[in-house]
Amino acid sequence: MYLAAYSNQYRKQDVMNASPLRLVIMTYDLAILSCERKDFGKSIKTISALRDALDLDYPEVAVGLFNLYQWCLDCIRKGDYVSATTTLNELRSAWLATEEKILARKVTTISPPPAYSTSFGNILT
């Protein structure tokens, strides 16, 4: 019981201190884990959070991601968690590479990826 409470507090602290880009990656982690566990509800919730957080003011990126998220949601509804997980892993890798490039440049402030707004609600906590 105590360990679970401590872990939850630690996770909340990570979320509070995370950059917008790190929040995107953390949401991917949760979506991938949910798909691997074949947790229908949490898979739908996390992928929907990624989709709903897209900033459509940047349609060049956002529309493509929107369509991929919709496709992943369709896969999950059909029980095809493997295809959804594969796609989410590829997208996560791309965002992680972006984060690594930014950190390598030693940028002190990281702005959110242009395709995302900055709110993910309580999906990560």
Task: Give the positions of each predicted feature.
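Surface/interface-facing alpha-helical segments and adjacent flexible terminal/loop regions used
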Residues: 1-52, 56-125
